[in-house]
Amino acid sequence: MEPGPSARRYDGPFALIDGGLVKAAAFGEQMLDSSVSTARFGLLVSRDKWKVVYADSFEPGEGYPRHAIDGDPETFWHTNWSGSKEPQPHEIQIDLGLKFELSGFTYLGRQNQVNGRIRDYEFYASSDGKDWGEPLVKGRFDNNTSLQRVSFDKPVVCRYIRLVSLSEVTGAYYTSLAEIDIVATKRLED
């Protein structure tokens, strides 16, 4: 239904568990009608079944790989920096627990400082966690604390995801990641 005076009136937050398209506009007796705004939302995905299956290194005591999927933007995965100085690239692989059709992913860099924020990256998807093929997307993240969304040219079906850091924003050898999430359009298994 198109927004209009007879459409359902917004009266508070509502669940959009399966994602969808939301159209909104403002109407009133003593105001001009607004233009229609449209936003598409992905499937709401629980991380209960997610697990990190591989990270090439981590900093003991603060940079555990599980922090990249714990939903807390203040925690982070950080590759080892106090012992060895393993150079880029660095990577993390995640089992989503179920197959999904993905249209993209989101990245949240470290919030409390710049150290380890990813600059150049590659993102892969796999059905079995072994055959990764070519990257779905290669790109460069902005050096900030904002959530960054990356969309794919076409949807992909997978159960495993892999983020590879090719470089760090200051040129350092280590990597950090506050949160990674998926933009799913379909849940294919339960």
Regions found by a protein language model. Give the residues of each.
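Low-complexity, disordered linker/stalk regions enriched in Pro/Thr/Ser/Gly
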Residues: M1-D56, G61-Y64
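Surface-exposed loop/edge segments in extracytoplasmic proteins
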Residues: E2-A7, K130-V137
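Disordered, acidic Ser/Thr/Pro-rich linker "stalks" and the adjacent N-terminal cap
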Residues: S37-K99, R110-R117, D131, R140-S146, ...
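Short beta-strand elements bearing conserved aromatic residues within extracellular beta-rich modules
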Residues: Y121-F123
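Short, surface-exposed tryptophan/glycine-enriched loops
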Residues: S146-Y160
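Short beta-strand-plus-loop segments that form exposed binding edges in beta-rich domains
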Residues: V164-G171
